[in-house]
Amino acid sequence: ICDLLTELGGDASVGEIDGAFCDGRYNVNLNGRKMVGTAQRWRQSGGRPVGLVHGALLLENHREELIAAVNRFNQACGLEQRVRADSHIALHEAFAAPDAISRLDGLYRQMLAQVFAH
């Protein structure tokens, strides 16, 4: 994902973003704002590490509604944390969707081919 964002002219990074919901050190960020949240679970199987890894990519700009829901939830749970819409960015805010999705698919397939070639 970072390769795609950089290829398209964005400033891609991985790490925490102040004010992001479900913040973590493996966020995928675009131009200093969170775009992808990730989660992973690792186990040993047959003497090697096996991971279940997934991400949630913000495609369209529904940040205000999303942030309002997260903040309502945090408040209802008695949590002090509040998140901010301007800490996030959607893919379509920065790049044309069909081109980006098609290229992401190609990069993913290329990565899988390399993984299974070794």
Report the location of each language-model feature.
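Long, positively charged amphipathic alpha-helical accessory segments at protein N-termini or as interdomain linkers
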Residues: 4-11, 41, 45-118
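Beta-strand scaffold of nucleotide-dependent catalytic cores
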Residues: 37-39
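Beta-rich nucleic-acid/ligand-interaction surfaces
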Residues: 14-34, 43
